[in-house]
Amino acid sequence: MTDSELMQLSEQVGQALKARGATVTTAESCTGGWVAKVITDIAGSSAWFERGFVTYSNEAKAQMIGVREETLAQHGAVSEPVVVEMAIGALKAARADYAVSISGIAGPDGGSEEKPVGTVWFAFATARGEGITWRECFSGDRDAVRRQATAYALQTLWQQFLQNT
């Protein structure tokens, strides 16, 4: 997805959130704040973007958004239980209506047989208690994996929670 397409998607998300009087927060690891950056590229995004958390280290995940050390130790940072706790923690800390969390292995190193480079977990949560998780495996270099993860996060937020609702 091009920068222009990411911006267009972010504008769609923003318009839908603004129409609802709702806000979103992000908790990002492998994307390093890219989702928050794309969101804040839109003029007026302060009306619907509460804040973003870049929780690259396990310590940051625990300190900033309350991911339990036991969860990190048992499942690893790139796992469904961790992204769920990231989304819930960000939602609570920001008092937002929607949360998006992302943790993955962008490469070129760090992959394993169980979690190859390109593996990314996503969680989406709402203040109403709804939530979904997804695991994707993207291809390409580090930049490509991170760009695809950013696009996927925005597309899923739009399609699953904001479009036609």
UniProtKB/Swiss-Prot annotation:
Supply the alphabetized keyword list: Hydrolase, Pyridine nucleotide biosynthesis
Instruction: List GO BP terms, alphabetically.
Output: pyridine nucleotide biosynthetic process
Stored SUPFAM superfamilies:
CinA-like
Write out the catalysed reaction. Answer: beta-nicotinamide D-ribonucleotide + H2O = nicotinate beta-D-ribonucleotide + NH4(+)
- InterPro entries under this entry? CinA-like_C, CinA_C
EC class = hydrolase
Query: Its Enzyme Commission number?
Result: 3.5.1.42
User: What Gene3D superfamilies is this protein classified in?
Assistant: CinA-like
Subunit structure, as described in the record: Homodimer.
NCBIfam families named among the record's database cross-references = PncC_domain, PRK03661.1
Q: What does this protein do?
A: Has NMN aminohydrolase activity, not active on other substrates.
The name of this protein is Nicotinamide-nucleotide amidohydrolase PncC
What organism does this protein naturally occur in?
Shigella flexneri
